[in-house]
Amino acid sequence: MNYFPWLTIIVVFPISAGSLMLFLPYRGNKVNKWYTICICILELLITTYAFCYNFKMDDPLIQLSEDYKWINFLDFYWRLGIDGLSIGTILLTGFITTLATLAAFPVTRDSRLFHFLMLAMYSGQIGSFSSRDLLLFFIMWELELIPVYLLLSMWGGKKRLYSATKFILYTAGSSIFLLIGVLGISLYGSNEPTLNLELLANQSYPVTLEIILYIGFLIAFAVKSPLIPLHTWLPDTHGEAHYSTCMLLAGILLKMGAYGLVRINMELLPHAHSLFSPWLMVVGTIQIIYAASTSPGQRNLKKRIAYSSVSHMGFIIIGIASITDPGLNGAILQIISHGFIGAALFFLAGTSYDRIRLVSLDEMGGMAISIPKIFTMFTILSMASLALPGMSGFVAEFIVFFGIITSQKYLLMAKIFIIVVMAIGMILTPIYLLSMSRQMFYGYKLINVQNFSFFDSGPRELFLSISSLLPIIGMGIYPDFVLSLASNKVESILSNYFYG
């Protein structure tokens, strides 16, 4: 056990420091913004330091573990720990949240509350990724929903209340299934009930019970991921939310669902996962085609990017369903890769909206000359989203492809069919992404916007865009940096639960 509580500090620090902002005298919006950014940078530095000096990449077991008795009456523990599966998502959370706080500089209305909610969301997400106790995981999962709902309902477009209500109905409704699953999995067995994930991973269940528990967890994680047909909250939410909130949603929140599928469904319920994986493969394949074919019909810029997120999540689901070393590694790389790509695209869409106050693609056009820096960055990131070689998306999707080919679970004809359908989806992806760029930046100039010659990207926006782009190129050139973090954990999961 690690005796210095690194993870407790990392989880508690953002929400604690953010709470001070609410109680200290109001010093103006600028002070609140820089205070929040300093907290995020300090948190990211602490996280990086703790992981660099304490995390051993060749060890698949839980590291930096903390285990404290919390509530004696309920036998409830504060258990935290990280492994190769969670370290990448925690670092991604820190990086994207820091960029999102910097992107939120234009927010002036109730900025104290806005930045506090971002920090509270930060703590909830880190807590979810580092929890080693099932009930603590559920609490952090729910803690993260409250700030998201308030961010959606208070800052955004005209229909923000509708989208926020739809979001909370979907996510809170699915959380009931998560809670039932948590209680069911912890209370089963002749021994005393346990919520410790490491003990639960070594426990076996009757097939019927395992299937019931698996379905409950799957519904909860399918809403967050999202999987079709439980995805309809996503386009509405992204279409109305402030773009800094969209960065957090696309970059981190969607990845929590995929993380839960691996951490709980795959690790704790291996037999049920083996039974359900063909269905997940079908859903993931349909999702790629469905989102890629539906996206061109979206006239709202942010909704079109949201559908591209749904399509990319299909590759993650297919990688998880392949039950192979390359497939699962590719899914984890895609989680990190799309976290950066999705957040960056929403940021650039938001900066464009700040200038022209339009989100309808039909009303845009001819902006390439007036805002060449934004045009260049948007084009490069669109290329990254459509998996251009040299970018992280290409490597992730290629590894997932390889995982399907090497899978021993599926017949050859089934694998060929899945690969062909995925290839069709990859052909459709450039169509809607490039048409989106064409509608925004080419063609005739806008006729409805006064004083068309608005300013281009400033230093803050350029820094944000480049900061998002560098990891995408870095992972595209040297993906082993991310893959090496999780490879031992992936081998451990597959050998212990499927091939052992």
Swiss-Prot record:
GO terms for molecular function: NADH dehydrogenase (ubiquinone) activity; ubiquinone binding. Disulfide bonds: none annotated. The chain crosses the membrane at residues 4-24, 35-55, 87-107, 113-130, 134-154, 167-187, 211-231, 242-262, 272-292, 305-325, 330-350, 386-406, 416-436, 462-482. It catalyses: a plastoquinone + NADH + (n+1) H(+)(in) = a plastoquinol + NAD(+) + n H(+)(out); a plastoquinone + NADPH + (n+1) H(+)(in) = a plastoquinol + NADP(+) + n H(+)(out). Keywords: Chloroplast, Membrane, NAD, NADP, Plastid, Plastoquinone, Quinone, Thylakoid, Translocase, Transmembrane, Transmembrane helix. It is an enzyme of class 7 (translocase). One of its GO terms (cellular component) is chloroplast thylakoid membrane. It comes from the Eukaryota. It is a multi-pass membrane protein. GO terms for biological process: ATP synthesis coupled electron transport; electron transport coupled proton transport. InterPro entries: NADH_Q_OxRdtase_chain4, NADH_Q_OxRdtase_chainM/4, NADH_UbQ_OxRdtase, ND/Mrp_TM. Its main location: plastid. Its EC number is 7.1.1.-. It is found in: Plastid, Chloroplast thylakoid membrane. Belongs to the complex I subunit 4 family. HAMAP family: NDH1_NuoM (MF_00491). This is NAD(P)H-quinone oxidoreductase chain 4, chloroplastic. It comes from Aethionema cordifolium.
